[in-house]
Structure formats: structure tokens, C-alpha cells
Amino acid sequence: MERLSSIDAQLRMLVPGKVSEDDKLIEYDALLLDRFLDILQDLHGDDLKEMVQECYEVAAEYETKHDLQKLDELGKMITSLDPGDSIVIAKSFSHMLNLANLAEEVQIAYRRRIKLKKGDFADENSAITESDIEETLKRLVVDLKKSPAEVFDALKSQTVDLVLTAHPTQSVRRSLLQKHSRIRNCLVQLYSKDITPDDKQELDEALQREIQAAFRTDEIRRTQPTPQDEMRAGMSYFHETIWKGVPKFLRRVDTALKNIGINERVPYNAPLIQFSSWMGGDRDGNPRVTPEVTRDVCLLARMMASNLYCSQIEDLMFELSMWRCSDELRMRADELHRSTKKDAKHYIEFWKKVPPNEPYRVILSDVRDKLYNTRERSRELLSSGHSDIPEEATLTTVEQLLEPLELCYRSLCACGDRVIADGSLLDFLRQVSTFGLSLVRLDIRQESDRHTDVLDAITTYLGIGSYREWPEERRQEWLLSELNGKRPLFGPDLPKTEEIADVLDTFHVIAELPADNFGAYIISMATAPSDVLAVELLQRECHVKTPLRVVPLFEKLADLEAAPAALARLFSIDWYRQRINGKQEVMIGYSDSGKDAGRLSAAWQLYKAQEELIKVAKDFGVKLTMFHGRGGTVGRGGGPTHLAILSQPPDTIHGSLRVTVQGEVIEQSFGEEHLSFRTLQRFTAATLEHGMHPPNAPKPEWRTLLDEMAVVATEEYRSIVFQEPRFVEYFRLATPETEYGRMNIGSRPSKRKPSGGIESLRAIPWIFAWTQTRFHLPVWLGFGGAFKHVLQKDIRNLHMLQEMYNEWPFFRVTIDLVEMVFAKGNPGIAALYDKLLVSEELRPLGEKLRANYEETQKLLLQVAGHRDLLEGDPYLKQRLRLRDAYITTLNVCQAYTLKRIRDPDYHVALRPHLSKEIMDPTKAASELVKLNPGSEYAPGLEDTLILTMKGIAAGLQNTG
């Protein structure tokens, strides 16, 4: 126990002053670390364990004293290791950071429970506390004087659609995620009140077993995941938390309504929460997403949905054993009973024919047969492409599944058994309404250019010219005349390139599969009305019976500025207005706009574009839904959910919100039951609050000031990123961007075009690379110049900026997120990368950027009125401090590994290897080196590099 107390003491030194005594984070952290170090000692010997502790201590000293010599000392220790040892060290620190994340998740859930018991607010994520649904409803009724009926009406009609995307940043393998989930559960149980000594011992053993199993699992994906892999990984969250979480959450909403005096439940068909997905539908820049992949993914989702329903319907059959029923149900049950001939031996329960005096079971057994057939048909279609089960024996629409369940519900209520009806049957009805037969609706995303290619091929084939070269007016005129006409445009003899066939086959897949598989058709890089009409025409030509809604996506700064005018032109087309029936969705992209103009200008332009788009829609009497394409990182629009929603412009949400939930954020949102519950709660509560109590509209003088700042910020950002001739070379040298492609994180290439500068780099690797060196350039660059400009112009502007920070949620959130990124950043680390990797003549550029970083941070604190970073959020500050020493060790390890990879003349004297292997103590950890035979670098270097990348990503929690 002595050692545990020494780790404990070391960790306690890092705690900021304002953290309360009942905070359990240090205890959790110390316990997991101690168990891990014991395991490390057992597996690899004392020397290696001591090395890990020494590295940690030197890094912790650097963090407290900021003495740059400590980084050199750490560098010497790490570079003297042999390849096998350096893999073990990198793996150990990466593993310790994953454990720290788990301790934190358990801690957040624990503080939330304490808070609910005490009934007070503990600041969780920021100055503005997130609320649960109950607090929100009470606040709306008590403080904001809304009537309970108004609140109920608003809640019933609102929809939050969470769109899961497989972003290449989910850096943790599923094999590890499952082990992490078990470690989390052990930790929760170990600290529960009523635990016996025997339980404690067994749980502790289980904890050690899971920590060791995770450590012994290869963290690195040795093959790149296919889109089908990504989709299966995304769907695993439905199995594990979302499926059961939704009805549980909706029950909590019922309870919250009861507490404000509404004695009704949320109707089961109220679309409070919906789920969609891009996995296997997003083909923008990902050649691996083919029409076959889309078809597979839809069938797989249908199979999974019917499987989940099958597993639950037997429980429902057990529950509904009543014999009293309505005449309507009795007639249906008798009819079904007469037509059922045989026993069903392939079921475990209720395999004999159900007797007529159990009418509900008769009805449900018929539903079960159809679900079984639906599942088997999807399975057969998936594996061989055809099925002997006729489609009429399966469920093809969600109404077919809802109808018999609704019949049971009505009958129970009519017989005075409403209490029973409101049990599992209501949960089941709510699941069917939420998930349908396809579990999630798949969005299709494609670049507008690809549609232009297809139409160009068609017009050339018809001999009427080149669509690509036509001006917008001519394009619209032709598209509308075709849409109003009846004749087919082209036959099977249309000459097609592979790319064109791919686009058309995608539409054929949409036509072939049931309509409820699909959500929206999103056009990226959309600029003009013809982009939208083109997709409408192609859907018609490929015989899509229920056309998908077409959603333009505006990303680049110039496109965002032009978006309102483009939408107005689209709405003024009569044909289109009739087609959309008063509803339109528009997607706005956060990633590319940030890469194009910097964070400040992008955030402000997104704000203004939304206001104007809503205004255009109002003028035409259209209800507009905004679809927010936010990343997990701040540079790509991430940040705490409730704040992001509450800081949107007034009137822009209006009860309907679509948001992407990406890669690593899926794990943080749905990885565990409590987290999943909190996520659903946050989105629902914040959307309701934004609609019923919109944030203040900014004052005209705030707008003028921000407009002026945005111009300066964009100028400063572009003058460095796009106009500084040495910048691209500096970026490639100072970060691991070139090596990023080797990580096998996602199924899509990291570049849109193989050669070229920053423009062709995807937003994700661009952010990922800067996050790795803890310099976060894309997030803050531009803020400093903007602040400096307005303060030099008139010092009274400082007062106005502070007023904006205190009174305008949007501005506050923008500044708070950048402050959080500064708290995670470390220019000393970035300087180390420069010293080791950047050529002599480029170093002054790095120095100039670091001076800019320091100045921006100073100005930002002045505007926020803070003396220190994060002084308003001691808990976040504590969490960041606890992990700094681990991340620093990984940074030093990464910088020196990059040096060894890139500089063939860089040699160091290696010490004898430290690590012992259990099976054969004479064998070093060099076995690890053989896991990667295809590496083009010296043995062990590539794996060490990848492990440091994954570790730093886990530590900073906002990868790309």
C-alpha cells in the first residue's frame, strides 16, 4: 500500500485549490495506476516498471516548473531504449491515459449522482451548467412562467436526430472498447456502498484481469477498416446502450412531466429522438463506399433491428398473459388462431401453438413469426444475394409492426389494464417508433461534381451540348423541363465511365431497397439550385419511388456567404416548392469552414448564415431544419453539447435539430449506460430550452465589432496558412502529418488529391497533426490579430468585448472553447518538435507562431476577465493537470521517434534491453517488433510512433 500512497500523493500535488473534498477522481486514478504498474512489473520486470515511473516523474517536474531541460533529460532516457522497450513504454503511457479517461467517466457519473441527492448544481462542463430534463421543465414553468401545457406541446412536437458518422478519428479498437467498458463497471462496483469484503476481492481480481487483457491486446489496427467494419462498430452501441436507453430515458421524461403537473405520458409516436447514420452512405472522397457497400449496410441494419425485436418479443409474450380483451382484439386473435397450422420448433419459448384463451399471445406470436422471417430474409440476401422467404411473409413497413402492438395497447386500456399497457408494451412501442425496421436511417452523401459528370454524359449522349459548360440559368431551365416532362432521359446504352456507373448504381440501390432505410441525400460542395435539382432528376430517372429529401451542404466561407441567396433562388422555383411541401433541410459544415478561414471567422459566418437562411425560409413559408456537421474537436466545431445548442442564434432550432455525432465522440456519448442517458437528456433539454427561451439576439454594435474582427482574423489566418510560402514545408516537418496515413484509423484516404498543399488535405488530418504537437494552431490562429486590432483602435472596445462575453452565449462559448484548448496546449512541447525536426532556416517561423500563441492567450484571458486559464472550472483544470505528465512523455517519445524515422544519420547509444518476457526471461520485448513486418522504417519505430499518436489522442480527447 505504500506505493499506492506515493502515487496518490504525487497525483494530489496536481489538484487545483477549488476542488471539493468528496472528489473521488484521485482515488480512482491511483487505484487503476497502481494495479497497472503491478501488472507491468509481473509481465516485464522491475527495470521497465522503474523506467515508466522515472519518465512520469521527470515529465511531472517539467509540467510544474516548465524547465525545458527536463524535456531533454526525458528525451535522453527515451531514445536510449531498444525498439522493443520503446514500444512497451509508449504502450504503457497510452494505456495509462485510457485508464485516466475511464476514471474520469466514472467520476463524472458519481458527481452527477451526488448532485442529484443534494439537489444542488455542481458545475459540470462550464460556467453554464447543463441541466437534466426535470430541471429544464421546472425552470421553464417556475422561472420563465410557461404553462405546463405549452411545455408539453413543445416537447411532443420536437425532434432531435443524432447522425452517427464513422470519422477516421475513432482511434480505439472495439476489442479495447469492450475491455474498457468492463474496467469501468468494476470501478463503479468497487466504490458502491454495500460491498462485502469477498465481493471486493473478486472485483479487484476482475479489475486486474481486464486491465491486463487490455494491455496485452494489440492497440494497432493492422488492416484498414472497411465501411462495413465501421458500420458494425457504430451499431454495437445500439446493442450495448442505446436500444435499452431510449425507453428508459422516455420514462424519465414522463416522470419529469408528472412533476410539473402533466398527467399524460409522451405519446409513443412522438419523435423525440431519432437516429441516422453515415456509415456506408458517405461516399464523399471515399472510393471504398460503393453501391454494394450501401446495400450491405442497409440489409445488415435491418437484420440487426429485427434481431433486437425478436429477442424482446418473447419477454412481452410472457408479460401479456391476460385473457380479458376487447372484441376487436378477440376477433383478430380467433382469425389468426384458425389460420395457424403447426408448432414452431425453432423457437425456444412458446413453440407450441398458443391456445385461444391467451389472445395477446396469439397476436404477438404472429408478430414474432414475421420478425423472424424479416431477419432471416435479410440474412439470406446479405450472404447470397437471394432469399427463398417471400417478401409478403416479412415486415416491410414500420406500420405493419406498430399496428398489432397498438391493437394490444388499445385493448388493455379498454379492459382497465392501462397500468399493464404502460409497462413493457409501451417501451416496445417507443422502440419501434424510434428505430423502425432499419435501426437507423442511412444518409447518402455525394459531391456535387459527380452529379454534374453524370448529367454531362447524358446531355452529350443526347447530342444537346455539354451540361458542364452550361451557365446556371441554362442548367436550371433544362432540369426543370425534364422534371416537368414524362419521357425517360436515357436507356441502358448510355456510355458510362466507372465513376458515372457508381453514381447511377447508388440511385438504383435506393430504388431497390425499402424507403425507410434512408434519410437524406446530402450534396457536399453545393453552390447553386441546379445542384439540388440534379439529384431530384436523377432520383426520378432511376425510379426511386419515395424520393429522398435533398440537402445541400455549405462548408467553405464563400459558400456560406452565398448560401442564403442560393436557397432563395431554389425556393422561388414553383416546381421545387410543390415538391418539398413546406419543409427543407440545410447542412452547414464546421470542419472545412474552419480550415479555410480559421475558427473565429468560421464560427461567426456560420452564425450569420443560419440567421439569414432561417429568414429566407420564413419569407417563403418553409420550415427549415439546420443540420450541424460538427466534429469532435474544437477546430471542427466540437465542444459541450448543451452549450453548443444554447449558443445557436435565436429561432434557428425551433424544435428540430440534426447533429452529427462523430467517431470518438460516439464513445464519449454512448459508451456506457449513464453516458448514453445523459446524452439523450442533454440534447432533448437544450433543444426544448432553446425553442421556448431563445438566447438574446446580439446588439447591433456587437455585430459590427465582430464583423470587423472576423475580417482581420481571416486575413491573419490566411496570410500564414495560405500565403506564407514556407508554411506548408514547416507544417510537414513540425508535425506527424506525413506519417498520419499509416494509422489505419478510418476507411477513407486522408487527402482528397494525392499532391498539393493545405487545400487538398482533409480537415481531420489537418487538425489531428496540430493536436499531436499540442500547438492547436487551427483553433486559435486569427484571434490574437483580431483582439489586437480592435483594442489598438479604441481601448473602450475591451469593455464591449467583456460585455459580449458575459451576455451573449454564442461569443462566450466561442471564447470558452478556445480557452479550453489553450489549457490543453503547450508551446514548450511544440518547440521541442521544432528543435528536433525543423530545418534551421524554418525555425524563425515556428518562433514567430509561438510568440503569437502566447500573445493570443494573454488577450483572450483579458477578454474573458480571467487571471488563469480555466479559473472558472476547477474540475476540468484538475482533469487536464492529472494527465499532462503522461501526454508529455508521449510527446517527447513521438518527437524523438520522428527524428529517428526521418534522419538516417541520427544515431544514439542504446542501453541493454530492460523488458523481460514471462514465457522466456531471456527474450526481450523484441517480439513486439515482429507484429509489423511491413514497416518501411527501422524495426519498432513505426509502432512506437502509432502508439504515441493514439495515446496523445486519448489524452487530449479531441483527436481530429
From Swiss-Prot:
Location in the cell: Cytoplasm
InterPro entries: PEP_COase, PEP_COase_bac/pln-type, PEP_COase_Lys_AS, PEPCASE_His_AS, Pyrv/PenolPyrv_kinase-like_dom
Needed co-factor(s): Mg(2+)
Keyword Protein transport attributed: no
PROSITE patterns for this protein: PEPCASE_1, PEPCASE_2
Active site residues per record: H167, K595
EC number: 4.1.1.31
Keywords: Allosteric enzyme, Carbon dioxide fixation, Cytoplasm, Lyase, Magnesium, Photosynthesis
Pathway the protein takes part in: Photosynthesis; C3 acid pathway
GO cellular component assignments: cytoplasm
Known catalytic reactions: oxaloacetate + phosphate = phosphoenolpyruvate + hydrogencarbonate
Pfam family, one: PEPcase
Lyase among keywords: yes
GO molecular function, one term: phosphoenolpyruvate carboxylase activity
Example GO BP: photosynthesis
Family matches, as Gene3D superfamilies: Phosphoenolpyruvate/pyruvate domain
Family membership: Belongs to the PEPCase type 1 family.
The protein's assembly and partners: Homotetramer.
Protein task: Through the carboxylation of phosphoenolpyruvate (PEP) it forms oxaloacetate, a four-carbon dicarboxylic acid source for the tricarboxylic acid cycle.
The protein's name: Phosphoenolpyruvate carboxylase 2
